[in-house]
Amino acid sequence: MKKQIFLLLVSAIAYCSCTKSPAQSLCDGETGASPKDIQPQKVTVGDFNAISATSSVDVVYIPSDDETSVEIRASKAVLPYISVQVDAHETLVVGMKKPKDPTKTKGIKEVHVKARPIGSLSASSSGDIFVKDGLHVKGTLRLTAGSSGDISCQDISCKDLHATSNSSGDISGKSV
């Protein structure tokens, strides 16, 4: 019995040692992407005043008064499954399309967004939003994280801040 428990423990440790960075999958071999396999792809979108990240895609949001751009960064195999669109409420929605074979979507999946300061950020279903270089909004800033979605930003300034977190969603920030 001790041998069986020992073998099970060794197997579990060996399996866990395959773990890469949090943005990459476990032992993904040919289906995942390492940073050198990333294929950047520019996306043209309409005007938006909010960002929503869903379905295990990370959004890196860079506030910029000068430029608006959206770029997907993922392996060539994953690119067709990443959805970036502006909905009827003028929200940039970033997520995943459901593939027939879920192993096709393993690996690094990031969307880099440069846009004017946005007043509403929402992360859900393991989608994460990372705000770089601070966020300065003249009016109200709404942050909503749920279903394991996370929002991380530093150096926040706004008139009113409304932050909601539930279902394992996290919101973190400094200098609010």
Where are these regions (language model features)?
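Active-site-proximal flexible loops/turns
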Residues: 9, 62, 154
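Acidic (Asp/Glu) and glycine-rich low-complexity loops/linkers
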Residues: 18-124, 130-144, 157-162
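Positively charged n-region of N-terminal signal peptides that target proteins for export
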Residues: 1-4
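Short, surface-exposed interaction patches in beta-rich subdomains
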Residues: 153-176
